[in-house]
């Protein structure tokens, strides 16, 4: 608020001179202090992707907000439309209990945004999801534990060997 008030004073030439003395430095000083207060009050957010453990860690000002498995963090191509039916796309970093972070603002170019989203997801080694809920363009690198379908992972059959089954193996 101090920043805005001092900016108005400087731009409107208010308090430039009081009783024949130059006083423009007071609003300028107030503007600098207001800007410093505004920037210092923004809390620092930090997202750590630990690929060796398969976990992510999200904190604000050093205090842990949430942590969980990697399959809960992803890059999503989001769709927005205007009143005239125009389609605009943006890339958003999302996750469970994470504040959505817009990585790339609105663009009409679907192919370029999809390429960039896939590239970012590959470099960060996280999942990528298209704007459609069910699409063949999704890239899933991390699956939840105990998922019914997880390509590349074959679930073991828990077979108990009995004496008759062991005898069948004899040649």
UniProtKB/Swiss-Prot annotation:
Main location: membrane
Transmembrane segments: 3-17, 29-40
Pfam (any one): TMEM249
Subcellular localization: Cell projection, Cilium, Flagellum membrane
Topology versus the membrane: Multi-pass membrane protein
Cellular component annotations (GO), alphabetically ordered: CatSper complex; sperm principal piece
Record key words, sorted: Cell membrane, Cell projection, Cilium, Flagellum, Membrane, Transmembrane, Transmembrane helix
Parts of the chain on the Extracellular side: 18-28
Cytoplasmic compartment spans: 1-2, 41-171
Subunit structure: Component of the CatSper complex or CatSpermasome composed of the core pore-forming members CATSPER1, CATSPER2, CATSPER3 and CATSPER4 as well as auxiliary members CATSPERB, CATSPERG2, CATSPERD, CATSPERE, CATSPERZ, C2CD6/CATSPERT, SLCO6C1, TMEM249, TMEM262 and EFCAB9. HSPA1 may be an additional auxiliary complex member. The core complex members CATSPER1, CATSPER2, CATSPER3 and CATSPER4 form a heterotetrameric channel.
Function: Auxiliary component of the CatSper complex, a complex involved in sperm cell hyperactivation.
Protein name: Cation channel sperm-associated auxiliary subunit TMEM249
């Amino acid at each position: 608020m101090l920043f805005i008030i001092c900016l108005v004073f400087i731009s409107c030439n208010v308090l430039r001179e009081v009783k024949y003395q130059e006083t423009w430095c007071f609003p300028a000083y107030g503007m600098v202090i207001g800007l410093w207060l505004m920037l210092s009050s923004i809390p620092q957010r930090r997202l750590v992707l630990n690929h060796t453990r398969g976990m992510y860690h999200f904190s604000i000002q050093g205090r842990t907000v949430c942590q969980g498995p990697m399959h809960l963090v992803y890059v999503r191509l989001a769709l927005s439309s205007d009143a005239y039916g125009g389609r605009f796309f943006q890339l958003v970093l999302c996750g469970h209990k994470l504040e959505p972070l817009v990585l790339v603002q609105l663009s009409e170019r679907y192919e370029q945004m999809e390429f960039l989203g896939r590239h970012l997801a590959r470099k960060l080694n996280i999942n990528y999801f298209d704007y459609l809920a069910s699409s063949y363009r999704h890239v899933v690198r991390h699956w939840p534990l105990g998922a019914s379908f997880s390509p590349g992972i074959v679930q073991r059959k828990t077979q108990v060997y009995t004496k008759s089954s062991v005898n069948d193996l004899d040649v």
